[in-house]
A protein has these predicted regions:
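Membrane-proximal alpha-helical signals and transmembrane carboxylates
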Residues: 2-368
Length: 368
């Protein structure tokens, strides 16, 4: 018996050494490596939807890397893979895509099926960035940008760097959307892309309730939403009299929320603290010299932020009747989860107050 065990052990070890100790891997040239994925739909009738999934794949050449877009069209997202494989000369490799771009039409139908098929595959890239686009996602994937092997590479960088301005967050990864989708008291937003004469551009954010897109807001409202919802980004606030007289203030925002409940009604107190520097002053030169003038400017900017926040809250509560600020999550953490409360409805009828505090820490290098 011992001889048999020893013989089998030697045989297994020999096979392990002969095969190199691991399964044979395929070379990159034999694989279709994705740069980005685009999700579109086509209406084939009153109750029939055709899913169109496009893959932007790298083409490796001796001196440069390019990309090519192939699409699959079928009645289910899974079937599009089979349809697409009939048109490409390499095996498709899942898990390296940089961006997932969803057309507005698909987003309005719902994106749960997209997330399901992505996360059912253990090789899927859960850190790929997600965005919604106007028009067809395939058109954006096919757009050529000088200096980049694919438009997906450019869009990835564009979304990542967006957090340096407009108070954008970095919570646009696939895993971020997946986590928020079924979390109590949480909705999510995604960057909204449009095509311009200069190429793709972030034009605001798409608003989601559950897994469906219910609206879109422009970049100015997006700045306010970002401050109110995450309070972790950076952006510019401007006090302006006319085209020649203005002050630009570049600041980092931090948010704190307090929640109270009385007779079943919720009240939320949002505190925004902005700290930063004046990067352009064409309005009041006394600000850099006079403490009283600086305090006056800080108060004026605080009031401007509060006014803009209150306008957005009115739109959120009356027009969308949804919670894009994750206030329901705050209330659920304090008063209990799984109580059956519809936090979107509760927030639409809640009292929400905003207090902004602006602090000027620096004023550039001075005047010359």
């Amino acid at each position: 018996m011992n001889k048999i065990i020893i013989f089998c052990s030697i045989l297994i070890f020999s096979l392990f050494v002969i095969t190199g100790g691991e399964p044979q891997k395929e070379s990159a040239e034999d694989l279709s490596i994705p740069a980005g994925i685009g999700f579109d739909i086509e209406k084939a009738g009153a109750n029939t939807i055709l899913y169109k999934v496009s893959i932007s794949s790298y083409i490796f050449q001796e001196k440069k890397t390019m990309s090519r877009v192939n699409s699959g069209i079928q009645k289910s997202i899974g079937q599009t893979r089979q349809n697409r494989q009939l048109k490409i000369d390499k095996k498709f490799l899942v898990g390296l895509e940089k961006v997932d771009i969803i057309s507005e039409e698909q987003a309005k139908e719902g994106i749960r099926n997209i997330l399901d098929i992505l996360f059912n595959n253990p090789s899927a890239n859960d850190t790929a960035l997600v965005a919604v686009c106007k028009g067809n996602a395939k058109d954006i994937l096919e757009y050529s940008i000088e200096g980049y092997p694919s438009s997906s590479d450019y869009i990835e960088g564009m979304i990542k760097s967006s957090k340096t301005f407009n108070f954008f967050t970095d919570n646009y990864k696939t895993i971020d959307v997946f986590v928020r989708l079924d979390s109590e008291g949480r909705n999510f937003t995604l960057p909204y892309l449009v095509m311009t004469d200069e190429g793709p551009k972030i034009d605001g954010v798409a608003l989601f309730k559950d897994d469906k897109m219910i609206g879109k807001i422009g970049i100015q409202e997006t700045k306010i939403l970002n401050m109110l919802s995450t309070g972790s980004g950076k952006g510019i606030i401007t006090i302006q009299q006319n085209s020649k007289e203005y002050i630009d203030y570049y600041a980092k925002c931090k948010r704190k929320v307090k929640c109270t409940r009385e007779n079943g009604e919720y009240t939320f107190h949002i505190s925004l603290k902005l700290k930063g520097e004046v990067i352009a002053n064409e309005l009041d030169k006394k600000v850099s010299e006079d403490e009283e003038e600086r305090s006056k400017l800080e108060k004026e900017m605080s009031e401007k932020v509060e006014e803009a926040c209150n306008k957005f809250l009115e739109i959120m509560q009356e027009d969308y009747k949804s919670d894009f600020l994750e206030l329901g999550r705050v209330a659920a953490a304090k008063y209990g989860r799984d109580t059956g409360i519809d936090w979107n409805e509760a927030l639409a009828n809640s009292n929400i107050t905003v207090k902004a505090e602006v602090k000027i820490e620096k004023q550039g290098r001075g005047d010359y």
